[in-house]
Structure formats: structure tokens, C-alpha cells
Amino acid sequence: MQNQGNKVLSAAMLDSADRYWLRLCDVWPEAKTALTAMQQQELTAVFGLSDYMGEQLCRHPEWIVQLFDGLLDDVVRSEFDAQLHSLIADLTQEELVKSALRRYRNLQMVRLAWRDFLNYTPVEESLLDLSALAEALVIAGRDWLYQEMCQQYGTPTSAEGNPQPLLILGMGKLGGRELNFSSDIDLIFTFPEHGETVGGRRTQANQQFFIRMGQRLVNLLDQVTVDGFVFRVDMRLRPYGESGPLVVSFSGLEDYYQEQGRDWERYAMVKARVLGPWSGYCDELHDLLRPFVYRRYIDFSAIESLRKMKQLIAQEVRRRQLTDNIKLGAGGIREVEFVVQSFQLIRGGREPALRQQSLFGAIDTLYSLGQLEYLAVDELKHSYIILRRVENLLQAIDDKQTQTLPNNELDWQRLCYPLDMADEVELRQKINQAMVTIHGHFNATVGGTDSHEHNDHWTALFWNVQQDEHANALLQEQQVDDAELWQLLSEWRQTVSKRSIGPRGRETLDKLMPKLLEELVTQTKPSQAFKPVAKVLDKILTRTTYLELLCENPGARQQLVSLCCASPWIARELANFPMLLDELIDPSQLYDITSIDDYPSELRQYLLRVPEDDMEQQMEALRQFKLSQQLKIAAADVTGVLPVMQVSDHLTFLAEAIIEQVVLQAWHQVASRHGIPAETSPSNMGFAVIGYGKLGGIELGYGSDLDLVFLHGHTGSGTTDGKRPIDNGHFYLKLAQRIVHLFATRTTSGELYEVDMRLRPSGASGLLVSEIEHFGAYLQQEAWTWEHQALVRSRFVFGDYSLAGRFSDLRAQVLKIERDKQVLAKAVKDMRIKMREHLLQVEPGQFDLKQSAGGIADIEFIAQYLVLANAHQYHELTIWSDNVRIFEVLAELELLPIMQAQHLTQTYCWLRDENHELTLQQLPGKLPIQSVLQKTDSVIEIYNEILAI
């Protein structure tokens, strides 16, 4: 053991220090003679406390001298900005700027970590120092790029001739000047007015200039080089997230937040602060955002919004099985932020003093306004400071963004040393007490879902009874006429007794089962209700958190029983993916279906909880979002809230939102390796996803696959702009391959969607992505009739909107080709016969909803034939890709008698409705033939009449 003042380094810390001393002496042999005994002792402590500091100081031994020569003195934050601008002012190459910024960042981070670990400064000051450093680095990079780009492209100006700057909103902890050691930084880029550049070799629109500048700035800060990175940059809080432009004007920001701003974006904007020197534009921007964040009235709706956000975080903790998380766990750092920001959102419209980004400042203001008692303020601040100090030290050990307590003894010792704690046990006790205190204040302010004691009545006896006669007597006493329930329950209990679920799990199960039985006996046939519920329980017996969730939430138990009874498909989903149980907690939210237009923004919000660079977690989050939204749709379906047409609408628009994010993720992954083609960006990628089949016809069902075709608009021989450039065609091929991979990879939450690419030109043997002109030529010159039929049910789903228009024109041109009706009718009928021969498998007396004569496929073929036969005369037939609206147009054009159109539409919707219902019951898509003849015989007559040869 070695003393540092009155503190002691453990043996493991000394071993770590010795390793760094050996490395240091290799690169600086005079180290021990150059440093005093006291300096050596302090450096030994630093080496033992932090691998990050050890690595950096061995790489840059000259920093040790600088640090001991005064750099460890109190930080003067204004010096960061001056030093950085001086450091890079004369540099002319971006790579040199990157290196300079990274070296400066690492030196200053070592300095701040040193001061933190050895208690040179309180944590509040440390957070201010880190925030000032980050802000100075961002602004130095921005200013260098602006000057460099103005020389190249001219200065962006407004219509009145005023130079336009790039303003950067710091969000989250950077905005609040409370940045922790290894945090990423959330930024939003904006500029005041549209216009053009002036004085360059060629003019550019201001937005184009700033998007290019923003891309370079993110790269300048975020890219990992031999010197490391400056800060990880997260741009997902901007309007429309990753699918939106990287930079928008003030007016664009204002329009977005007025028309589409979400509650979570209000919450995020509380912390928003313009970085860098203040100007009139900064005042203008804050004035523009204020009405969105702070309402003129006292806004208690903020409480419910924050409560929902907290529930989402709790779900994420459970789903990712996060333990010992001092940020997201109950009583963690996030709950303090929720408490303070709930008051800010509720009362900030009336109390200007609350409109501040700093949590410390806001909480003091709440006391001065009488909104929080002194004891509450004192306890919250004290507990928050403990957690922020632990978080900061935890991250400074190895410059890693983590809020999870250590899983090894050495790192616990490293935390205990600066916090004057004897050991892990004492420090854990201090942390736990802080989190209990915070959680109490959170529940008092924002509210939670803590359970109340439940009166278990007779079901507690029933669950614990050992003998058949006692069990049957209890059932008779309670007038439950279902003897099979006891038989099933006792058999299941015996099976469970052999499972290894641990004492906590068994205790929770014993509390849960009486409560669950109370729900089961309200069903018409409790024993039948128990069977699917038991399958769910089987899957979560070893996941005690989910047993506790059901135990503590009456709404979840009620929904579990009712939904499992209503749909075996839902029961299977809950059993296969227990994280869906979170969706059952609040029935009002379960049946509050996401509106059709909100799926993209809901998914963007959902993905914000996952680190942008964690590909595995991003893939898992996409699957979890799909599963949870699909469950909500199914719950509304089985309870009759949604008719079949709307079920398909919701499933289709959910898929579209997911396609958008998959394409964006694939784009970033391929671009990070190879760069991107010229004149492209995530919002202008020269790439399009075309949906065919049920996706194209807006008719997806549960478990539908996605029929996709990929197009790109780049011709010629250009290459990408990355360090490993490839030709543009190869880039789009890699993009398509990556998209398919992201869909098909099986994670713990399964496959995202099964993707069918066989409708692309030349089918499975063709290229995975087609240049749009080649695609058009193929359709007009080489495609079969069945490919033109498929085109009827196709539409642009996501991508570059310039390609959307080109695809729409191309589709219309092909559909409007004049065809010989006799030849067409024969080709359509032959294809239908071929399909039936390959796909129809029914027992005598059974009707296959899709493939039997008079079924779904016949109705689809009628629509496709009539479009292909008549679109050359009636261009309106090329507008829609769904059968229902095609029949409407056919009736309006008198190409189909209105009675026939109505009958086909009604039968089509009825067959799809039955198919949905059978899917939810986990039954094959077949019915007794007698139950459908009245409807389908008429379809057969219409089919034969229209396709008569």
C-alpha cells in the first residue's frame, strides 16, 4: 500500500501504476530524476486511478511537465477559446486541424481528470470546465471551417446582403453546462435566412453551403484518428431526425416545432443553448424557440408527458437488462432532471426565471419561488452531486461513455479512492441511499407506477392448496364451475417447482399467482384462459423483473389475460418476446394507437435512447419498436377498435417508418467506410425503395414479408469521396446488401422483416439495385405480363424524392402501354392457373382465402387486368396502387358496373378481414367452403366474364 496524503493506493492500483511507470521510463528515461518525490507520488496515484490518463501521459510525457508547471492550477475557462483559435488559425489543411484539436482535447481532458480524481475541484466546477472545453472545441472547428469554406465558395448572405452565420444549439448536458467526462454531444445546426453565397468561384444556396459545412464539422469532431476523437457528435435531435436535412433555417425550425414538435422535443429544448459568442441572431433564435418550450399558461400536461418518457426509459432498462445504471435506473440522474424539468415546463411560461439550461440554477430558482421545500432541494442536490461525481470518475477511468457501476474490484477501488470510501460496500450504500432519496422525490413530483398492496382473497389459498378435494371445495365455494383449472394449475405448479428460478423469483411468483388467478376466474372458461397465460409465464420464470412487473401492475395482469384469451397469436408474441409485457402496464396507452403519420417521429424518438454508433443495439431497437407497435395494433384489432382497412394501413405505415430508418442506418454504415457519391446526402441520397405487393397496395398483414425493389439515379463513372473510394454503382450495391442484412439478421428479438427481392429485373439472378433508366427500359422491353401486373401494386416508399417523381412517371408510362386485350387476358389467366397449381392446397370442403377460385388472388387479378387493359385510355387508373381505390376509379369511369365494383370491394375486404382474424387465432387461412360460397360464386362469375377469351 502507498499513501497519497492520508489516502492509500490498493495493491491492484499500485500494479497498474507500476506498469505505466515502466512505459514512461522507456520513453522518458529521466522521468524520476526530473520529478520531485511529491510529484512522483502524485503521478503514481494518477497512473493507478485511470488507464486513460496513463495511456495519454505515456504517449505524451511532455504533458507531465506542463501539468506540474501550472496547468493543474484552477481552470480559466475563457482561455480554452483563445488558445484553440490561436492553435489552428494558421493551419491550412483539415487533417492538421483534426490532429491539433484532438491533441488539445486529450491534454485538457487529462488535466481535468487529474483535478477530479485528486479532488482539486468540486464536481460542479468540473462539469462547467468540461462543458466550456467542449464548447470551445466545437466553436473553434466551426470558425475554421467557415473561414475556409467562404474562401472557396463565397460568403453565405441573405437576400438583403447580410452575411449568414452557422449557429449551433448545444443540447442536453452541453446546453446546461453540465457535461460529463466521456459524454457525446447533442447538437442542432441552423442558420438565420435563405440566400446564396457571394464572392466565391460559383454560388451555392445557403442551405447547401451549411449542410456541407455541417457534414465536415461533424467529421472534424467525431472521426476517430490516430489521435482519437474530439467528441462523439449526435445530430439526431434535429427536426425529422436522421431523415431530415442536417441544417435548417430559422423559419424551417419554427415551422417544424409549431406544426410537428413533440412533447419529448419540448423536454429536450429546455436545455438548448446557442454555443459560442452571443449575437443578435442568438437572441432571435431563443425567442423563436421559447413559445414551443414554455406555454403561456400553467401546463400540467407536461407531467403526463414526462411520466410516459420515464416509463419508456424503465422499459429500456428492462429490455437491455441494464443493472447498476446510475443514470437510467430508478432514482438515477435522469429522475432528478425529470423533477426539475417538470417544474420548468409547467411554470416556465409564467416564471421567466425558470427558463434556464442549468439544473443547478433551476433547482435553486424553484426554492426561491416556493415550488420546492428547502429539504427537498438540499436532498436532491446532494444526491445528484454524488451520482454525477461517480459518473464522472467512472468515465474518466478509461474515457468510456458508461453509467454502469464496475464489475471488477480494481475499478471499485479507483472510485473509492477520490470519494474517501473504505470499499465497494460503503460506496454502494452511499449510492443506493442517494438513489432511494431521488426516487422518492421523483414519485412525489412526477409520479410512478409503484404498486399498492392487493387483497388476494381466496386465490392465495387456492394457489397454495395441496389436495384435490380442498381445491375443488374452494372452486365450488367461489362458484367457479371449472374443475379442469385445478388440474392444469397443479400440474403446472409441479413443473415450475423443478425449475431453477431462485428465491427472489419464487417469492415473486407466489405473490403474483393469486392476483393472476383473480383475473383468470373472471373469464368464461378459466382453464382455457390459463393455457396461453401459462406459456407466457414459462418464458419469464427466470426473468424476475417481468414477474415483478406483472405482480405490481394490475393493468398488465388484466391485459395479459384478456389478450391471451382473445388471440393465441398475441399470446405467442408475448411468450416469445417478454419485453412486450411493458406495453400492458397502462391500458390507456396500449389502446392509444400511434396515428398513421406519427410512426416516423415515434421511431426516431425511440432510437434516440440507443447510442448511434452501437449497431447491435440499433438493430435490436428497431425490432423491439416493431414488436411493440404491432402488439398495440393487434390489441386494437381483437377488441374491434380498428377495422381491417385501418389495421393494414397501420401495419403498412409502421413498415415504412422502419424502412426509412434501416436505409438511413445502412447509408451511414456504408458511407463511414467508403464515403458517398458526389452531390448526395442522407436527405438526398440518389436512392429509392419501391414497395410491391401488400406493401405497395397498403395491405400488409401480421407477419407479411416486404416485396422491395431498389433503384438509384447515378449514371456514369463517378466514385465516392471516402478514404476507401468505390464507384457509385458499387456503393449502391453495397447499400442494398446492407439494407437486406439489417432486415434479415436475427437478434434476440428475431428478424425485422422477411424481404423478398424477386420482383427486381431478372428476378433472383438480377442485380440487387437497378439504375432507374435501366429499370424503365427493362419494364418496357423485356418484362413479362406478370411483372406489369406486379407494377400495378407498386409505389415509392422511401428515398430521394426526385427519384419518386421519376418512378411515378415511369410506372405510368409502362401501365399506359396499349395492349391486345385478348392476349392480355390469356396471359393473366394462364398466370392465375399456374399460381393455383403451385400454391393451392386444400382439403375437400375447404376454401383457401387467397388461392381458391373466387378468393383474394382472383380479385387482385381482376383489378390488375382492368388497369393494364384500359390505362392507355384512362390515365386515372395509374394513380393508385391499392385494389379498393382501383375499383372505385373503375366504377367512376364506368369500366366496371358499380354493383360489381362494390361486390368485389366488399368481398375483398371481408376475405382480408377473415384472414387477419385467422392469423390472430394462429389458424391457417382457410374456411369451410359453405360459409363463403354466397360471396365467392359472384366473384367467379365476374372473373370469368371480364377475362373471357
Swiss-Prot record:
HAMAP family: GlnE (MF_00802). It comes from the Bacteria. Residues 1-450 are annotated as: Adenylyl removase. Its cofactor is Mg(2+). One of its GO terms (cellular component) is cytosol. Residues 455-949 are annotated as: Adenylyl transferase. Involved in the regulation of glutamine synthetase GlnA, a key enzyme in the process to assimilate ammonia. When cellular nitrogen levels are high, the C-terminal adenylyl transferase (AT) inactivates GlnA by covalent transfer of an adenylyl group from ATP to specific tyrosine residue of GlnA, thus reducing its activity. Conversely, when nitrogen levels are low, the N-terminal adenylyl removase (AR) activates GlnA by removing the adenylyl group by phosphorolysis, increasing its activity. It holds the Pfam family GlnD_UR_UTase. GO terms for biological process: regulation of glutamine family amino acid metabolic process. It catalyses: [glutamine synthetase]-O(4)-(5'-adenylyl)-L-tyrosine + phosphate = [glutamine synthetase]-L-tyrosine + ADP; [glutamine synthetase]-L-tyrosine + ATP = [glutamine synthetase]-O(4)-(5'-adenylyl)-L-tyrosine + diphosphate. Its EC number is 2.7.7.89, 2.7.7.42. NCBIfam families: PRK11072.1. It comes from Shewanella frigidimarina (strain NCIMB 400). This is Bifunctional glutamine synthetase adenylyltransferase/adenylyl-removing enzyme. Keywords: ATP-binding, Magnesium, Multifunctional enzyme, Nucleotide-binding, Nucleotidyltransferase, Transferase. The gene is glnE. Transmembrane segments: none annotated. Belongs to the GlnE family. One of its GO terms (molecular function) is [glutamate-ammonia-ligase] adenylyltransferase activity.
